[in-house]
Amino acid sequence: MTVLIDGRAAVRPELGGVERWARELCARLPALRPDRYAVARPPAALAHRAGHAWEQGVLPFRARRAALLLGPANLAPVAFPRNVVVIHDAAVLREPGWYSAAYARWHGALLPAIARGAKRVITVSAFSARELRELAGVEAAVVAGGVDARFTPGADPGPARAALGLEGPYVLCVASRIARKNLAALYETGARLAARGIDLVAAGGERPQFRAARAPATGPRDLGPVPDAHLPGLYAGASAFVLPSLYEGFGLPCLEAMACGTTVVAADAAALPETCGDAALYADPHDPAAIANAVERALDPSTSQGLLAAALERAAAFTWDATARGVDAVIDELLGTDSTMHAMHAKR
């Protein structure tokens, strides 16, 4: 074994973009190179515990014989000298007010320390690479995320509709209940759409370390966290998908919706135009009226049919196998250029 992967985020009960990345890398890298990769999973007592006992305490000991330690979910042991870390965005540095005060203080110091001490930083978009260069003073290799083959226009919406109580047509948003997802604008957009007879439903869980807007009495229906098995059908059954985020390091739900043949309305902000390309409609995230108007355009059959081929082609360009190969190429470069480190640990 040459490279140990931190598997903590892969076993978290919540499932956002970071956790999806961790799960996919923990599965695909050992399959790609079984002689190179192994996964370190925390014991049950530490797997879901708040704090950093695993990353900063147990994990460095587990990785002591590894040539490299790969952290796929923003975190790595600060004192470990052979980290490769995937940092998905620099949101905590760009806008600390999106987070609880304690989280912003701790991670605002921890993220730059991890990044500057790493052998290599990987990030998920050119946008995030620019943010890390500006705010943390580090260069990052860009490796985009992927879309699982489960997300397809043929996904059956029936089980998701039945389980979640969805009867009529709906517009979907999949996003955690955190401030940078622009929930205030989403809720106002939902109210505007409801006045026009359009139902907006929102799926995603809360994270206590992040600040979030409170849902008003009128607005989108809140589904809460949705089981992963229902997501493809939920996307495929939607009349349109909307993600009005102020800040995304990548924007994976947009690609998942595209892969299911659902027209996407995205904020023209952060990494979303980079990820979605010309396969989505865009709106100013600060203007709920513009978002609602873009959703209405997405519901027009002539618009949605015009975007369908581009959306399917765009989503097909992002695969988790390609992500794994991209990360492995970064590891190859490190092990190949640092031959002394590689030889030393190969002998152990």
Language-model features and meaning:
Residues 1-348:
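Carbohydrate transferase catalytic cores enriched for Leloir-type hexosyltransferases
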